[in-house]
C-alpha cells in the first residue's frame, strides 16, 4: 500500500464571530486574535489592510518564536498565547560590555520595549478587524481569491487556503483556473495554501480530478520546457493522473464477479463484457494505441509517474480511473486532426460519420461528458447527426451524445450494450411523465454489468495528451412540454389570482403561431451545419430518441459538444468567466441585460471543447439562406410588427444587444463578423468566438476601432433611431455600465490573476490591466457616463471600420 496524501478535515464555518476559527490547527493566525468580535457593518479597506499587516506580525512571533522589532532587534514572546503576550528584546547588553556602552544599550533596549508596547496598544483595537472581515457575511469566494492573490503573508494565505473548504464546491470551481494558475506561477507559500484543497477535492470527485489535470497541463505549457518538466504544476498533475488521489475506500476494492440479474429490456451481460481480444479488435480508433494493462505509462510525453505510484499495491492490475475518459477524449481529438487534412467539406463529413461509427463499438463505457452537470455514462454517439462546422483552416465538428443518467458515476455499473438493430418494440415507457421518477427507478430500468473498477473492457486504457470536454445539460422532460399562451397565465399560477383570456385572443394567438412557424433552411453542401443548427432542439431530441436503442429508457438524455483541434481555448475560458461574472452582477443589480455564457473545456494549449448554443444560427447563415434583411427575417419568423411574438423577440434582441455591446467594449472583443454572432429562436443575439480580446486583434489588422458592433440593420430591428426600443437600448447600456463598475474588482481580478506567467496574446503589452480598469470609468459621474454611452453608440453606428471589416470578411471568407 503506497503512502497516501493526508488531506485536512473540511472546515465548517463558525456561526458566531466570537467563536474559535474554523479549522484552527493549533497556533495559527486566528489564535492571535482572541478578542470579542462583533458583527461587521462597515469596513474601511485601508484599516482592513493595516490590520492584516499587524496580525501577520503577531503570526510571525507565534510561529517563529522570534521576530524583528521596528529598530531591527530580535524579539521573543514570553507568553505567546494571546494578544497580551509580552515581548522582550534578546539583545540586552551583557555585563562584560564596556561601561560607556551600558547606558546606550539600556536606552536602546528601553526604547525598543516601549515602542513595542506602544505598537501593541495602538494595534490591539485593530487586530480583530481582519478576522471580522473573514468571518463576516461579506466575505465571499471572490474576496478570498483576491486576498490569496494580493497578500504576501504566509499566515493570511494559509488561512484563506483553509477557508476554501467552507465555500460551496460550485463557487470554488468557478475560480479553478485562477487557483491553478496561482499554484503554478506564484511562490511556494501560495501553492502550499492551495494544494490541500485541490488534493481533497480530487479524492472526492473524478470530474474535478480530470479538470485539474487538464488545466495544470495547459497552464504549465507557457513555461520553458526545462522548467515545466520539474515544476510544481507538472508534479501535481502526475500525482492526479497516477490515481494516488483515488478515494481510499476504493483503492483495494476487488471487482465483484457475481453476475448481475438480467431484466427483460436488455440483452445478456455478454453484450458488453467482451474478451480482451474482442475489445482490442473492436476499438482502436488509432492504430498505434497500446493497452495500459501491459504498458503502465500514462502518457508518452511524461517521463514517469510520480514516485509515490511505485508503492501502490500491485496484487491486481488496476488501470488508472481517469484513463478511460482520457482515451475517449483523445479519440475525439484525433478525429478532428484527421479531418483537417481533407480538402472538401463533403469529404470531411463522410469521414466524420465513419469515424464516429467506429467509436460506437466501444460504447457504452465508463466515460462521461464533463460539462453535463449531472452524473451519467455515455452509451452512444448518433454518428449520422454529426456535422463539420465552418472553418477555413481547421475542422471543428459538432456531435450529439446519448447518455444514461445515474446516481453516482463511480459506483453505478456501466449499462449493458444494446445492439443497433434492437430498437424497442413498445413506446409505452417513454410516454410516461418523468417528473416523479426517482434515482432508484431510473437505475433499475436497464440491465447492468458488474461494477468493474478495473474494467479493461469498458474502454481501451491508452495514454492521451491533456484533454477534456464541455457541453450543455439537456433534460428532456415530458412535464415541460406544456403549451403556454402568455406570460400572464404563468404569473397567475404563481400569484393564485384568476386571469381571464377571451376566446378570441386564444384563437388569434393560435392563428399567429400557425401562420409564422419557423422556416427550415435548405441543405448546403458547403455549409451542412446550417440545417442541423436550425432544427429546434426538442424536435432533434425526439427524433434521435426514436431511432436509438437506448431511447426507451427513462433516464436517457441527449447532450451535444463542439470539438476543436488546433485552437487555444484558454482565452475563450477567460471570456466565459468574465461573462459569467457580468451576468451575475447584472442579475444582482436587477438590470435586465441578457447574455449567454457557454461552457468551455480547455484540453490542452491547442485543443478543447465548447458547449453549443442550441436553437441558434449565425446571422451569416440567416442572411445567406433567407436572402432577407435582418428586420425582414424577424417579420418572417415572428409575425408582423404588432404581434406578441414579434414584440417579445424585439425586446429580447434589444436586451441581448445591449448586454453584448458592453461585453465587447469592456473586453475589447474583435473579429465581430456575422459568422461570430448568432441569432436564436427567441430573438436574442449571442456572440461567440472570443479568440481576440483585450490586447489582441486578428492579424493585427486594426480594422475594428469602434467600441462595439452596432450596424444599421441592428437599429432597424430596434425600431429606428427615434423608436422607444432604441432609447430603451441606450438606457440599458447606461444601467449595465453603472452596475458593472460597482463591482469592477470582481471582473478585473479574474483577468489579472490569469496574466500571471501567461504568454497569451491577449496579455501582450504592459498596460492591459490598466486599460481594462480605465474602461469602467470609476471617476465619472452618472451624467458623464450617460454622455459617454451616447458617444459610443453614435460612433459605433457610424463606424466606417466596421463596414470595412464586414467587407473584408465577405471578400476573403464569403461571410455575409
From Swiss-Prot:
Modification Phosphothreonine occurs at: 263, 438, 517, 519
Residue spans of biased composition, Polar residues class: 278-297, 306-318
Keywords: Acetylation, ATP-binding, Endoplasmic reticulum, Golgi apparatus, Kinase, Lipid metabolism, Membrane, Mitochondrion, Mitochondrion outer membrane, Nucleotide-binding, Phosphoprotein, Transferase
Modified residues (N-acetylglycine): 2
Renumbered residue ranges of the record's region Interaction with ACBD3: 2-68
Domain (PI3K/PI4K catalytic): residue spans on this chain: 535-801
CC annotations in GO: Golgi membrane; mitochondrial outer membrane; rough endoplasmic reticulum membrane
Record comment: activity regulation: Inhibited by wortmannin. Increased kinase activity upon interaction with NCS1/FREQ.
Pfam families per record: PI3_PI4_kinase, PI4KB-PIK1_PIK
Domain PIK helical: 52-242
Subunit structure comment from the entry: Interacts with ARF1 and ARF3 in the Golgi complex, but not with ARF4, ARF5 or ARF6. Interacts with NCS1/FREQ in a calcium-independent manner. Interacts with CALN1/CABP8 and CALN2/CABP7; in a calcium-dependent manner; this interaction competes with NCS1/FREQ binding. Interacts with ACBD3. Interacts with ARMH3, YWHAB, YWHAE, YWHAG, YWHAH, YWHAQ, YWHAZ and SFN. Interacts with GGA2 (via VHS domain); the interaction is important for PI4KB location at the Golgi apparatus membrane. Interacts with ATG9A.
Family (UniProt): Belongs to the PI3/PI4-kinase family. Type III PI4K subfamily.
Protein name, as recorded: Phosphatidylinositol 4-kinase beta
Organism expressing this protein natively: Plecturocebus moloch (Dusky titi monkey)
Name of encoding gene: PI4KB
